[in-house]
Swiss-Prot record:
GO terms for cellular component: ribonucleoprotein complex; ribosome. Belongs to the universal ribosomal protein uL3 family. HAMAP family: Ribosomal_uL3_B. It comes from the Bacteria. It comes from Rickettsia bellii (strain OSU 85-389). One of its GO terms (molecular function) is rRNA binding. Pfam families: Ribosomal_L3 (PF00297). This is Large ribosomal subunit protein uL3. InterPro entries: Ribosomal_uL3 (IPR000597), Ribosomal_uL3_bac/org-type (IPR019927), Ribosomal_uL3_CS (IPR019926), Transl_B-barrel_sf (IPR009000). Keywords: Methylation, Ribonucleoprotein, Ribosomal protein, RNA-binding, rRNA-binding. The modification N5-methylglutamine is found at Q151. One of the primary rRNA binding proteins, it binds directly near the 3'-end of the 23S rRNA, where it nucleates assembly of the 50S subunit.
Amino acid sequence: MRTGIIAQKVGMTSVFNNNGKRVPLTLVKVDDCQVVGHKIAEKHGYNALVIGIKDKKISRVTKPMKQVFANAKVSPKTKLKEFRISEDNFIDIAASLEVDHFTAGQFIDVTATTIGKGFAGSMKRHNFRGLEASHGVSISHRSHGSTGQRQDPGKVFKGKKMAGHMGCSQVTIQNLKIFAIDKEQGLIMIQGSIPGHKGSYISIKDAIKKISITA
């Protein structure tokens, strides 16, 4: 199991393939992605690489993190993330990771944070149908309805789908295919959509449920 990389979402576009079919693409940019540290099983209990992306002003870095970057001999990074790896897949500290870490046609898993929607009702958050539009229903048309049973159990069970905060949650989209790679621009073109807003940071790893790198 090898490391993944951190990228920044640029936006979406579309192209036509050789069969004339329109293919939606998400563009992500890999900028100054470097190995910042190692986590080893003997000391930390697991093997991992600490990856950082996008240079950051030294004045905006805390003193403890300044020492971390100084020990690694890399410029301060905006975003850091650990990636679990197998023992034979360590990469030297300060080594750069480019878009050619992946290949066109490869399947990947993308982890990102969804766009926050604030407090949302049950119809928007959980796709409930709501109550009737008439026939005696008053001011409860978008309500979720009953939330429990009776005196026994006398409570609302944990996990009950109700209105609440929607979005801002970490999700992983599996088995997305890399359409193409632009090494000069540092771009990876991924078929389909991925969570998050423009400019948000995402992590990309080899797909764990796809053995072949081509479709």
